[in-house]
A protein has these predicted regions:
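Gram-negative (and chloroplast) outer-membrane scaffold detector with strong preference
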Residues: 61-135, 203-216
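Short loop/turn motifs that connect adjacent beta-strands in outer-membrane beta-barrel proteins
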Residues: 19-27, 66, 109-116, 160-163, ...
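Predominantly the C-terminal beta-signal and adjacent terminal strand-loop region
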Residues: 78-82, 94, 161-247
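Transmembrane beta-barrel strands of outer-membrane/channel proteins
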Residues: 30-36, 71-75, 119-125, 156, ...
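Residues that define the transmembrane beta-barrel architecture of outer-membrane proteins
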Residues: 26, 51-55, 94-100, 115, ...
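Sec-dependent N-terminal signal peptides
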Residues: 4-12
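Short glycine/proline- and aromatic-enriched beta-strand/turn motifs that initiate or cap beta-hairpins
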Residues: 17-60, 207-222, 242-247
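Outer-membrane beta-barrel translocator domains and adjoining extracellular loop/strand segments
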Residues: 41-50, 80-88, 129-138, 179-186
Length: 247
């Protein structure tokens, strides 16, 4: 019975070497999931935006064992903005946003590789397409200014197995974009309309992403680590067999 118990414990310990979730230089990390954007505007902003979400995809390349560079993009989605003084139902425009971003990431190396926290700092480029004026501004020419802004990131992967992890990612940015409205005489205001209206966005959104993560090891280093693991596993098994024989 004692021999059987020792053998079972040893088998579990050697099986713990069956996969390697540690990240190293040359590895690729792919993430895909859904991102929720929580708009946050400054108090003096005249416009607001409803919360929305979109599918997103990113990939990271590990330049060192701890430092990686990530590129993220999402599927374009239509977004509505409204006049804050008139409420969410008072939509004044809609547009489609493309906001790819790149971040430099630092991956911490905890002893428990099943939990991989990281932080990041990067840039987000926002361009806007198919702008359309709505409501009281219908008929006018509505345009949003492109912007390049800093973005801050934190998150973690929770490892399910060697290839797949669950990911939570949070990003914070402050956009420098603004909006302008011209040709206001074409709206219901007619000849009494001002020549131009400018809006400062003052938006400081927070994004929260829930993702699946796939880890792809550097083939050469993966073979080296696998060979080392096999040698260690073999050594452990020999020690276990010797311990059983000595009982």
């Amino acid at each position: 019975m004692n021999k059987l118990l020792i053998f079972f414990v040893a088998l579990l310990s050697t099986n713990s070497w069956g996969y390697n979730s540690e990240i190293n230089k040359g590895d690729w990390i792919l993430r895909s999931g859904y991102t929720f954007l929580l708009p946050q505007f400054s108090n003096d902003s005249q416009i607001g935006m409803a919360r929305f979400g979109m599918p997103t995809f990113s990939f990271s390349y590990l330049m060192t064992d701890n430092i990686g560079i990530e590129f993220l993009t999402g599927l374009p989605s239509e977004i509505d903005i409204y006049n804050k003084s008139m409420g969410e139902e008072a939509k004044i425009a809609s547009f489609i946003s493309l906001s790819p971003n790149a971040t430099m990431q630092y991956y911490f190396k905890p002893k428990n590789y099943d939990f991989r926290p990281y932080v990041g700092l990067g840039l987000i480029y926002s361009s806007f397409h198919k702008e359309k004026s709505l409501g009281i501004l219908s008929g006018a020419n509505f345009k949003l200014k492109k912007s390049l802004d800093p973005i801050f990131q934190t998150g973690f992967d929770y490892v399910v197995n060697e290839k797949i992890s669950l990911n939570l990612d949070v990003r914070k940015l402050k956009t420098s974009s603004g909006a302008s409205v011209t040709e206001l005489h074409k709206t219901i205001m007619g000849p009494y309309a001002p020549q131009r209206i400018d809006y400062e966005m003052g938006m400081q959104p927070l994004t929260v992403s829930l993702n699946f993560t796939w880890l792809f090891h550097n083939p050469k280093k993966f073979r080296e680590r696998r060979s080392l693991q096999e040698r260690v596993t073999l050594k452990q098994k020999r020690k276990t067999i010797k311990a059983i024989r000595d009982i």
